[in-house]
């Protein structure tokens, strides 16, 4: 339900308005009936502007907003500015991404430096796979229920619960002297990772203005890659320190404590407060998020959220959950959104990124590098830099475009790596990696270069786009839908973590990376035919696009139209008249 704004009174001449629209200049709209405090902004990206019949004394412009059930920037005086409060909420939530990345980064270094500290013996390949996969298993379990838990207990409480899981898991690992205690610690930490990996993007998407929702969600991915980079850096520094791996694990408690402390003083999202009937808190959060917005329109937004909340079927929590699951699978647009969300998360895992990161240390050793933790910084650093590139491009270039750039690039890099592995002659004997034949020394350099190329294309596309999953689903199935998608990611991670070393032994590194190249090629085809362009679209428009198909051409045309509208008119400033306020 959008706001109906009948007319905005202009003191600008008709010709000047026309020139402004054509030249993308701002047009000032003022009212003699209202105060400057109610000044707002509106962009043509989410509105159609129609010229109404002009009176003798003034021009009148009719603005017809596009309905959007969850777009704060449309409902709240069309204000696209980013407040310090929203920035604070985004960065605090994104600490979950940092902890996620740190967890995936430190285990690679820890497995190398553990030595005989567990059970007084060296870990076997099977034990390493179990320790690595335990976190993925824990994350898979909690991600299935995290979406529903977020609706029951709140996004904030779920994030704080994930902090407690991190603390328990880290303490068990730091104090571990047996393999099974280490594995249990990793499992419990995985519970926290699974909750945080789902709730943090959901939290950010619910407090972010639409025009920069993509960028703010990418901040979580940026912190994830930053966590990996920090973990590799710390691992390199502690590689030769006695019990350095315990210190490495213990350092994960620092961001956990920071996030938990900050969340104690910050609110939940407005949508959650509305779900619980606490309209006063919802109004308070919206006021702090959009400080230049009139109280009338904030109250209108709260009323709309109340209406949307009442539209969720079911009289109690179990019935609502069951009906939501049915609606997710039976409504065509929801089912297509689910296919896209789960498909992208599966692609992220089954194109070999985690596998390549795990093996990068051994690859670099074959060309003369001895500290595998240190050289892994090159790959994780590339991942971080190109995630930053995605941050600046995802809302401008578009989600679909960067995916169709990234996936073919990944396929090419994997093919080259497979060929290079074949000529380099690396094979596994079941216990350690052995260079059977070095072949041409240049093949090692080729592998290094294309591992970096792979990391760049991964970070640009499939490393970031799947976490935009919240925008695929309407409000009443978003929690369950994002749970499905995130669980798919962790199921894939579990499969890869528990089988990668076995694949290297059975089908050789060359065959393993050729397998990933084939999956990457199929993934490109999937995205080309099934993933529409969603950048700049209203949430209502996303559901319309997916109603009777994936409608790739229609989505591209609509996204192009939105960009043209923004190019024609940057913004319209206005002050609502009392007539408008009463009508709202």
Swiss-Prot record:
PROSITE patterns: MFS, SUGAR_TRANSPORT_1, SUGAR_TRANSPORT_2
Key word Repeat present: no
Transmembrane stretches, start-end: 82-102, 130-150, 164-184, 187-207, 216-236, 247-267, 350-370, 377-397, 401-421, 442-462, 487-507, 511-531
Any single GO CC term annotated in Swiss-Prot or TrEMBL for this entry: fungal-type vacuole membrane
Annotated glycan sites: 371
Organism expressing this protein natively: Saccharomyces cerevisiae (strain ATCC 204508 / S288c)
Name used for this protein in its record: Myo-inositol transporter 1
Disulfide bond among keywords: no
Catalytically driven reaction(s): myo-inositol(out) + H(+)(out) = myo-inositol(in) + H(+)(in)
Comp. bias intervals (Basic and acidic residues): 30-42
Subcellular localization, as worded in the UniProt entry: Cell membrane
Family, as annotated: Belongs to the major facilitator superfamily. Sugar transporter (TC 2.A.1.1) family.
Protein topology in the membrane: Multi-pass membrane protein
Phosphothreonine found at: 12
Topological domains, Cytoplasmic: 1-81, 151-163, 208-215, 268-349, 398-400, 463-486, 532-584
Domain of life of the source: Eukaryota
Residue numbers on the Extracellular membrane side: 103-129, 185-186, 237-246, 371-376, 422-441, 508-510
CDD domains to which the protein is assigned, alphabetical: MFS_HMIT_like (cd17360)
Sample GO molecular function, one term: myo-inositol:proton symporter activity
The entry's keywords: Cell membrane, Glycoprotein, Isopeptide bond, Membrane, Phosphoprotein, Transmembrane, Transmembrane helix, Transport, Ubl conjugation
InterPro entries on file: MFS_dom, MFS_sugar_transport-like, MFS_trans_sf, Myo-inositol_Transporter, Sugar/inositol_transpt, Sugar_transporter_CS
List of residues that carry Phosphoserine: 26, 31, 35, 37, 46
Region (Disordered): 13-42
GO biological process: one example: transmembrane transport
């Amino acid at each position: 339900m959008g706001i109906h704004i009948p007319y905005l009174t202009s003191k600008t001449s008709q010709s000047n308005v026309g020139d402004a629209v054509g030249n993308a200049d701002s047009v000032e709209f003022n009212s003699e009936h209202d105060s400057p405090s109610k000044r707002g902004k509106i962009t043509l990206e989410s509105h159609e502007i129609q010229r109404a019949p002009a009176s003798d004394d003034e021009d009148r412009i009719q603005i017809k907003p596009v309905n959007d059930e969850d777009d704060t920037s449309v409902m709240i005086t069309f204000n696209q500015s980013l407040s310090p409060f929203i920035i604070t909420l985004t960065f605090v939530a994104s600490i979950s991404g940092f902890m996620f990345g740190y967890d995936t980064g430190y285990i690679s270094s820890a497995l190398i430096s553990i030595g005989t500290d567990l059970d007084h013996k060296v870990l076997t390949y099977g034990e390493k796979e179990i320790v690595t996969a335990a976190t993925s298993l824990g994350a898979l379990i909690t991600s299935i229920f995290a979406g529903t838990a977020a609706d029951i207990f709140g996004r904030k409480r779920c994030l704080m619960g994930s902090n407690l899981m991190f603390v328990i898991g880290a303490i068990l690992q730091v104090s571990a002297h047996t393999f099974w205690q280490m594995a249990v610690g990793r499992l419990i930490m995985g519970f926290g990772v699974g909750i945080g990996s789902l709730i943090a993007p959901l939290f950010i998407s619910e407090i972010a203005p639409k025009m920069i929702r993509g960028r703010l969600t990418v901040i979580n991915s940026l912190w994830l890659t930053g966590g990996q980079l920090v973990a590799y850096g710390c691992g390199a520094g502690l590689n030769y320190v006695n019990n350095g791996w315990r210190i490495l694990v213990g350092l994960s408690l620092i961001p956990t404590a920071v996030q938990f402390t900050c969340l104690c003083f910050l609110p939940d999202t407005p949508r959650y407060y509305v779900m619980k009937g606490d309209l006063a808190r919802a109004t308070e959060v919206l006021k702090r998020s959009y400080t230049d917005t009139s109280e009338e329109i904030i109250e209108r937004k709260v009323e709309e959220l109340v209406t949307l909340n009442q539209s969720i079927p079911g009289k109690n929590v179990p019935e609502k959950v069951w009906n939501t699951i049915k609606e997710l699978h039976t409504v065509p647009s929801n089912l297509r959104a689910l296919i896209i969300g789960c498909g992208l998360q599966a692609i992220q895992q089954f194109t070999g990124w985690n596998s390549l990161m795990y093996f990068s240390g051994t690859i670099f050793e074959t060309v003369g590098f001895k500290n595998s933790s240190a050289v892994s910084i090159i790959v994780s650093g590339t991942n971080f830099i190109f995630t930053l590139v995605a941050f600046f491009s995802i809302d401008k270039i578009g989600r679909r475009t960067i995916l169709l750039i990234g996936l073919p690039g990944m396929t090419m890099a994997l093919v080259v790596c497979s060929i290079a592995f074949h000529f380099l002659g690396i094979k596994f004997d079941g216990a350690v990696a052995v260079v059977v034949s070095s072949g041409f020394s240049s093949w090692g350099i080729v592998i290094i270069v294309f591992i970096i190329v792979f990391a760049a294309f991964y970070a640009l596309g499939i490393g970031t786009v799947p976490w935009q999953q919240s925008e695929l689903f309407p409000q009443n199935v978003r929690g369950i839908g994002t749970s499905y998608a995130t669980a798919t990611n962790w199921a894939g991670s579990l499969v890869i973590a528990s089988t990668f070393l076995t694949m290297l032994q059975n089908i050789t590194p060359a065959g393993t990376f050729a397998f990933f190249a084939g999956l990457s090629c199929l993934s490109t085809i999937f995205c080309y035919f099934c993933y529409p362009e969603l950048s700049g679209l209203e949430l209502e428009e996303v559901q319309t696009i997916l109603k009777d198909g994936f409608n790739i051409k229609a989505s591209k045309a609509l996204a192009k139209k939105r960009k043209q509208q923004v190019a024609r008119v940057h913004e319209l400033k206005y002050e609502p008249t009392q007539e408008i306020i009463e009508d709202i």
